[in-house]
């Protein structure tokens, strides 16, 4: 079976606190997974590891068969879209500019269908509006739109509501 994500005995420690201990899992294509647990149980740490924002203390993981290493991190990041609790948006920029910036960060050419992405995220006709004028809900939707830039193969939602 082909797996989108393979996690092998991953552990992550912060000084005296162990956030993850020997976690292994396989996520098949098309699957939907949810991580449920108390605060501090390692859910966000696992997501940050998968996204390449942190490195594990031990163990390994691969996205679409590509081991997540320093050399492969940019390739892996282009295949992941992530929506976090507090999305990283530029308040001084318009919604369109935020999406174009994400394409630049990913090293991808700007996409002509930015209006389509905004519509998909429920932000029809907001492309020219500055994000600082958006409600919290609209900012969250903009975070979703940003995560969809580059048509990622793997979408991660970390407390998106």
Positions of PLM-derived features:
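Helix-to-loop junction immediately C-terminal to a conserved catalytic motif
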Residues: 51
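Conserved ABC ATPase "signature" region
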Residues: 100, 104, 111-126
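Hydrophobic anchor residue at the start of the ABC signature
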Residues: 144
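Catalytic Walker B motif of ABC-type/P-loop ATPase nucleotide-binding domains
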Residues: 155-159
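Conserved ABC transporter NBD signature motif
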Residues: 59-69, 75-76
């Amino acid at each position: 079976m082909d797996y989108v994500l393979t996690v092998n005995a991953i552990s992550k420690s912060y000084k005296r606190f162990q956030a993850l201990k020997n976690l292994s899992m396989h996520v098949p294509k098309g699957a939907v997974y949810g991580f449920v647990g108390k605060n501090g149980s390692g859910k966000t740490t696992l997501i940050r590891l998968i996204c390449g924002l942190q490195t594990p203390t031990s163990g390994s993981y691969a996205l679409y068969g590509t081991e997540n290493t320093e050399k492969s991190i940019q390739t892996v990041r282009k295949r992941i879209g992530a929506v976090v609790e507090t999305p990283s948006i530029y308040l001084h920029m318009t919604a369109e500019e935020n999406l174009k910036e994400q394409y630049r960060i990913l090293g991808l050419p700007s996409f002509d269908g930015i209006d389509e992405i905004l519509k998909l995220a429920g932000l029809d006709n907001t492309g020219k509006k500055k994000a600082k004028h958006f409600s919290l809900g609209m900012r969250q939707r903009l975070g979703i739109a940003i995560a969809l830039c580059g048509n990622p193969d793997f979408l991660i939602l970390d407390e998106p509501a």
